[in-house]
């Protein structure tokens, strides 16, 4: 069974998460140690800064230190920081986003730059609360360790433009293609009433709903309830969820599986909007009580994907922080 939320509790089996928190802090400290004073000043931002919550996936100026500004050893230390949270598939997802930025650079010019992906650290590594972000065009990974025993990894956004590379040395590359294929398998395997329950709109939405500052627009979960699926159908939905949730380091995934059992995966719903014809605009999502995974492919002739994993209570470690401040008011 897959994870249902991004907030990772210690609980009785907390040793793995304790190790993860220490590993992440050590990787962040090593990264900081590789920087000179000027670079360190660019990277370090107060945890309380509004910027920590100001995530986005459009090409824009960002705080932090870009990969393009780093020396080779610094870029290696940054990658080790990413690897403290992500597994190999997760790292390949980051690489794929930047590869596609290179494809766009060839088509559109230097405005597109695989080096313009920025690392920011919020607070002091190992001293709660603290966290970090890796962000650029079509990528936003937000890691927060708000209190001892909590790790949040959302919002986690990945985009793919082009969704399918149509020419050049990377022709045929589909960064998020497996997600679309799984979603189409799910829809193809439904009977008529299940398909009608899953279809929430005849046209795609044109964008993810839970974009920055808009997560409330999602409302209550809609679509086909997973409790009504048979085992094979549910396995496909879980495999679809795993395209995001399964990108984390093994110990973090293990903690998420415990969380999933608490939340109950049967309460999730699968929804589709738009055309079922390959190559045409479509949207789908898996939405539970607090967790949502969205995928929209509408722009540029349905060759431009926006996908996101949100935890609607634990993004940025918010619920852990709120609980902490209730218990220990800060003046």
PLM segments and residue spans:
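Hydrophobic alpha-helical transmembrane segments of integral membrane proteins
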Residues: 5-6
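N-terminal export leaders
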Residues: 1-2
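Charged, amphipathic alpha-helical interaction segments
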Residues: 9-10, 32
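Sec/Tat signal peptide C-region and signal peptidase I cleavage site
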Residues: 11-15
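A cross-kingdom marker for long, charged
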Residues: 16-87, 91-331
